[in-house]
């Protein structure tokens, strides 16, 4: 949302539909000599009534990824594939004991649906990342060279499931863990890892993730090679950016949790890559200045010649990328709507865990994936009931979301994610970390430096108040 709408979202709402008042990059391209494309496989991006494809001239969606995996629910699963073959027995037993049966059920359902899709694959060229990049190339081949174009390629990989090539190809070994002999748990159970996984299992899960990233990198290279072959290299700006990282275990790997199941904006989740390549931009240069998701849209419209509007809260990064300026802001922020705010400076990172009396914006009582998602799918659910097809899984009302919602540890719609075993559990005290001595945020030094913590907290509160006011 922040990438498309040029505005910070942390102070306003979580993952929810676009508002009529939101202005996106595609909206700004309308009426201009610019063709716009959306190529994606992100289920959350196309939730009913969310409107993220709004304004794009051409849209391609590839079925099957998370929250859309029910697309394959009625396919027959052959080849001897079984969901339980991708979880260690002791993990399934402990998950039921520690987290409850409702946690395993939606996960097993998702794995089974994924296997029903995966059984059709012949090579890594059938993976979602490969199909998305090949579709992007097909559209690049057809662009009108007399016009500018804006292409948003939203590739859900390397998001879970981390089904890297070695998982489904018996002739391959994971290049980052070739000697592992256990099961490939490519969709690990979310939650605290203590008592659930062994250290060796966690190591292999991270190796599968690394292999999945390598696969995505290969197919991103396919896109870049075709940009060069098509003669677009000298007049096309390419921005590679992610929306979040992933906790994957103990210590610096994930602060004790697996996957995005707590509203904790630590380094492994909040520090994401942004790589830019384009004519006039120096090569092989790493920029230390802070950038944010809301800088993507101003950068794109600046490049397209539309101009950066004063109401945009983000900044065009072209001056920063060219070396004309050293920075566009003094600090960055991160966090989860309703649960956490974080401020990151050159020397420090500070995390404030919100209390109940601080959650008072208009729709704050509904967490991420809360009220908006429920309302947006309600009409489809009513249609399903009216047609009396209660026994069918194919009447789509985001069954995946409903399954995950049942498994969450919060009641009703007051939950912040549609991930099974997720909870709003947050630490009791705010946290301060020295970025130079402790880049992975493992040693809270707020008691040792209370004056620094107080100063950063005041700065953070002021900035969030300004965002709310604007």
Language-model-derived ranges and their functions:
Residues 1-470:
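Catalytic domains that recognize anionic headgroups
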């Amino acid at each position: 949302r922040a990438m498309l709408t040029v505005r910070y979202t942390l102070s306003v709402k979580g993952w929810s539909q676009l508002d009529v008042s939101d202005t996106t990059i595609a909206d700004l391209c309308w009426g201009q000599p610019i063709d716009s494309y959306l190529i994606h496989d992100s289920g959350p991006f196309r939730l009913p009534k969310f409107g993220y494809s709004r304004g794009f001239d051409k849209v391609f969606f590839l079925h099957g990824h998370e929250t859309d995996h029910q697309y394959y629910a009625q396919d027959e699963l052959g080849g001897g594939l079984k969901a339980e073959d991708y979880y260690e027995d002791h993990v399934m037993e402990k998950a039921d004991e520690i987290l409850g049966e409702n946690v395993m059920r939606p996960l097993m359902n998702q794995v089974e649906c994924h296997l029903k899709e995966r059984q059709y694959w012949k090579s890594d060229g059938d993976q979602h990342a490969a199909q998305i990049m090949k579709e992007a190339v097909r559209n690049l081949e057809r662009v009108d060279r007399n016009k500018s174009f804006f292409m948003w390629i939203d590739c859900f990989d390397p998001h879970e499931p981390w089904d890297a090539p070695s998982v489904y190809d018996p002739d391959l070994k994971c290049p980052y863990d070739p000697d592992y002999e256990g099961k490939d748990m490519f969709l690990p159970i979310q939650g605290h890892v203590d008592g659930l996984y062994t250290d060796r299992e966690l190591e292999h899960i991270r190796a599968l993730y690394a292999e999945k990233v390598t696969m995505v990198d290969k197919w991103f290279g396919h896109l870049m090679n075709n940009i060069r072959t098509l003669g677009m290299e000298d007049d096309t700006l390419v921005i590679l950016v992610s929306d979040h990282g992933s906790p994957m275990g103990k210590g610096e790997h994930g602060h004790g949790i697996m996957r995005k199941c707590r509203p904790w904006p630590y380094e492994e989740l909040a520090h994401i890559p942004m790589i830019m390549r384009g004519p006039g931009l120096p090569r092989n240069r790493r920029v230390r200045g802070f950038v944010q998701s809301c800088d993507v849209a101003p950068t794109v419209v600046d490049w397209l010649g539309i101009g950066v509007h004063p109401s945009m809260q983000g900044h065009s990064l072209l001056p920063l990328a060219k070396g004309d300026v050293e920075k566009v802001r003094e600090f960055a922020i991160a966090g989860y709507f309703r649960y956490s705010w974080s401020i990151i400076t050159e020397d420090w990172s500070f995390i404030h865990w919100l209390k109940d009396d601080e959650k008072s914006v208009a729709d704050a009582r509904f967490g991420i994936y809360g009220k908006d998602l429920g309302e947006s799918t309600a009409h489809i659910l009513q249609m399903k009931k009216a047609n009396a097809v209660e026994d069918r899984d194919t009447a789509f009302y985001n069954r995946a979301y409903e399954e995950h919602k049942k498994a969450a540890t919060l009641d009703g719609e007051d939950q912040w994610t549609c991930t099974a075993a997720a909870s709003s559990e947050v630490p009791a005290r705010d946290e301060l970390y020295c970025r130079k001595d402790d880049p992975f945020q493992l040693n809270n030094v707020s008691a040792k430096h209370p004056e620094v913590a107080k100063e950063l907290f005041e700065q953070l509160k002021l900035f969030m108040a300004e965002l709310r006011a604007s």
